[in-house]
Design a protein with these regions (language model features):
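Post-cleavage N-terminal segment of exported redox proteins
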Residues: 1-33
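A generic alpha-helix preference that emphasizes hydrophobic side chains
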Residues: 14-16, 39, 107
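Electrostatic cytochrome c docking/interface patches
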Residues: 20-44, 55-66, 75
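Short N-terminal signal/transit or membrane-insertion segments
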Residues: 29-30, 36-41, 45-48, 79-95
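Solvent-exposed, acidic/flexible segments
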Residues: 32-39, 43, 100-103, 115, ...
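C-type cytochrome heme c attachment motif
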Residues: 44-56, 96, 106-117, 121-124
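Mid-chain, structured segments of secreted extracytoplasmic proteins
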Residues: 62-100, 104-107
């Protein structure tokens, strides 16, 4: 029985290593964090096209505005489309239960994706 278990483990372990490898090589991305105009454009794109489903619940509007050099009034008029305050987290209105019915699963929060999967993965995903 021990030999059967050992044989099974040695045949299954290599499969798990192959499953963890990326299916395709990721294209490298070079992000210039000092290019405020590009970062502001990315924020606009995210809030207009992604934030309807994907939240950024670990990020605050105020922090984004400060980091990107956006005045509070401009941020509230052009980026925040809800009744949220400048110090609120960037949440979405869609309930997870509704998302599960509509899409089969709740869309993931995107706050920490770059930290967890890396910027190359995120660039290739988008």
């Amino acid at each position: 029985m021990k030999k059967l278990f050992a044989a099974l483990m040695f045949s299954v372990l290599p499969l798990t290593a192959m499953a963890a490898a990326p299916a395709i090589p990721l294209e490298k991305v070079d992000i210039d964090l000092t290019d405020k105009a590009a970062m502001q454009d990315g924020l606009k794109t995210f809030t207009n096209y992604c934030m309807g489903c994907h939240g950024a619940k670990f990020q605050r509007y105020e922090r984004v505005a400060n980091d990107l050099g956006i005045p509070e009034e401009v941020m509230m008029e052009n980026i925040v489309f809800t009744d949220a305050k400048i110090g609120d987290h960037m949440r979405i209105g869609m309930q997870p239960a509704d998302a599960k019915v509509w899409f089969g699963a709740a869309p993931p929060d995107l706050t920490l994706v770059a930290r967890v999967r890396g910027t190359d993965w995120l660039y290739n995903y988008l």
